[in-house]
Amino acid sequence: MKKILLFLFFLTYSFNSTAHMAHYNKFNKIEMEILRDGEVIGYNYYFFKKDSDNTTVTNQLKFSVKLFGATIFEVESFGEEKYIKDKLISFNSKTRQNKKDKFVQLKLNDKENEYDIKGSSYTGNASLENVIGNWWSHKILQANSQISPISGSIKEQVVTFIGKEKIVLYGKMYEVEHFKLTSKDMTLPKDKRLNFDIWFDKKNALILKVAYSRMGNWEYKVKNFE
């Protein structure tokens, strides 16, 4: 039954895939809080700038994990995706993770019909079927692989429909669809493996919540969008 529901989900959204960026024309920003073990430790903000068929999505992320007052893990990142209509033209990011610099420089190669990537973990090309692994876009639920927005590495994934649910975020109830996003190869080391629960608000075409466990229980939750 789940396989049938999953097929119907992809069938429904495949007809709308060319209008993907149009779903976000109404947004100026999406604000997510980052929580670890129930405590707010940072934020993940997305800002949208539109000019005719051109859309720029700016991503700002920052969080830090402390233990007995000492910072044991921290990340600060800035990224920018550029689209013409529904086509990703370029993506660039710079990230500071535990005093280490990481980056991605991606651009569309029209001649070869692929992406050219130069990143801190991967340099080479990638199929246009890949998506940037950011939480603002529901296309991540339709893709077979994603490009890390921090390092440029390519990760194959499997998305499974769990069911329809109701969740409450900041005093407001939403009807959502619950998905599980995992690595295609689950034998990968845990720190390299994708293993996320995702709650998607179909009405607003918005991922409202993401949860995973790694050195604690993490949540990304949409606090505000406008």
Task: Write out the residue ranges for each language-model feature.
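Sec-dependent N-terminal signal peptides
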Residues: 4-13
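Hydrophobic, well-structured mid-protein blocks that either form specific transmembrane helices
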Residues: 93-133
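Alpha-helical transmembrane spans
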Residues: 8, 133, 137-139
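Acidic, serine/threonine-rich low-complexity disordered tracts
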Residues: 20-109, 139-226
